[in-house]
């Protein structure tokens, strides 16, 4: 369980823009927190967008009486569309504490308004804080839930639908190999699954329900997560909790 409390001196436009990014992190977000939306794409403009995040830090450990410098993130990503209904993203981590990794590599199809079909290497749709990019994080490091319970990325297929024109609800379901990013040749009889419901009740309050089911060996593990966010008078409040069972 973790909680977040943020303050701002007034409800300026800049603050509201930041809050909107924090609340609206979901399956349709690209590297800079904006959305790839079919209705906003220009039919004749296929020029890719380039994004990047660089995060360096210095740490001191009182227990060890030692310190270190680190490049925690040096991300580079390319997003764009090849058709009004087809978008793509490729993201590379050049330095994750000295390691290079391929992060996102997917194609997204938007056949009708509100519907998004994504195939490839993606972040699992579980936990709001898990879905945040480094430049949107509320702390210097990931929360306990993200670092200990959420298997961040995998290869699979997700389907998401945003019914905001009818009801303020978004739904995303995903199925994944369950082997992580670098072991994609194994034939699978059991997959990992995630489900996510986002309730955007009003501009002051929203919450989400999350479910993840994985089977790394012979035991299936199910995780249930709920997150809530509130914004009023320049204050951002956020809380998230998780419960785990074994079958």
Regions flagged by a language model, labelled:
Residues 184-185:
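Inter-helical turn/loop segments and adjacent helix faces that build the functional surface
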Residues 15-18, 22, 155, 231-233, ...:
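A broadly tuned "polar low-complexity/structure-edge" signature
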Residues 9-14, 113-130, 225, 236-247:
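Glycine/serine-rich loop-strand microenvironments at binding/catalytic pocket rims
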Residues 39-180, 189-191, 198-206:
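Outer membrane beta-barrel
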Residues 188, 198-247:
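Detector for outer-membrane/organellar transmembrane beta-barrel domains
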Residues 4-55:
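N-terminal periplasmic/intermembrane-space "pro-region" immediately following the signal or transit peptide
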């Amino acid at each position: 369980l973790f909680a977040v409390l943020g303050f701002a001196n007034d409800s300026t436009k800049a603050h509201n823009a930041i809050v909107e990014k924090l609340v609206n992190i979901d399956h349709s977000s690209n590297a800079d927190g904006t959305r790839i939306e079919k209705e906003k794409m220009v039919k004749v403009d296929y020029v890719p967008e380039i994004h990047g995040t660089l995060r360096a830090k210095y740490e001191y450990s009182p227990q060890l009486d030692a310190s270190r410098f680190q490049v925690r993130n040096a991300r580079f990503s390319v997003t764009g569309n090849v058709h009004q209904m087809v978008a793509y993203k490729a993201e590379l981590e050049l330095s994750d504490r000295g390691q290079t990794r391929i992060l996102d590599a997917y194609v997204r199809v938007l056949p009708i308004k509100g519907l998004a079909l994504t195939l490839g290497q993606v972040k699992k749709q579980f936990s709001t804080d898990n879905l945040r990019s480094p430049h949107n994080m509320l702390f210097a490091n990931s929360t306990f839930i993200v670092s200990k319970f959420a298997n961040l990325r995998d290869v699979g297929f997700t389907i998401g639908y945003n019914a905001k024109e009818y009801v303020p609800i978004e739904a995303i379901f995903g199925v994944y190999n369950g082997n992580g990013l670098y072991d994609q040749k194994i034939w699978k009889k059991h997959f990992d699954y995630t489900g996510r419901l986002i309730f955007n009740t009003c501009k002051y309050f929203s919450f989400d329900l999350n479910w993840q089911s994985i089977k790394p060996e012979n035991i299936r593990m199910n995780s249930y997560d709920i997150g809530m966010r509130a914004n009023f008078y320049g204050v951002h409040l956020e809380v998230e909790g998780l419960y785990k069972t074994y079958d």
